[in-house]
Amino acid sequence: MSVVMPVQAADILDVRLWRAPDHTRVVFDLSDTISYSLLELDNPQRLVIDVADARLINALTNLPLENTPISRVRSGVRYGDNLRIVFDLKAKIRPKSFPLEPNERTGHRLALDLFDEDIKDSEVPAVKRVD
């Protein structure tokens, strides 16, 4: 006999966004780790994040989108409990995503960097490391 335990959905507790010189960073504050996938779409330009078994706690309507490649952010539920977040874009970008482990100040996070397509890697200023 086996027992199937329900998997608890992860909550996206908050979404923060800010502009850097060469990219826009979006950080999703999470209640737990998530399983996600990214999809880029053309005509019109969009970036889609599908998050398995997750729910969005706060609305995405108050993000500071001025001076970013993002024109609008929207979300919806797919297949019962999967969350889809869509970034409608004004320009082509190069996305990079990575999870961030909890630390003493924050919990689980997902970082999403949207690099400006017109800036080449060689043009990105080097960051000086201070130990």
Regions found by a protein language model. Name each.
Residues 7-131:
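Signal-peptide-cleaved, periplasmic/extracellular N-terminal interaction regions immediately downstream
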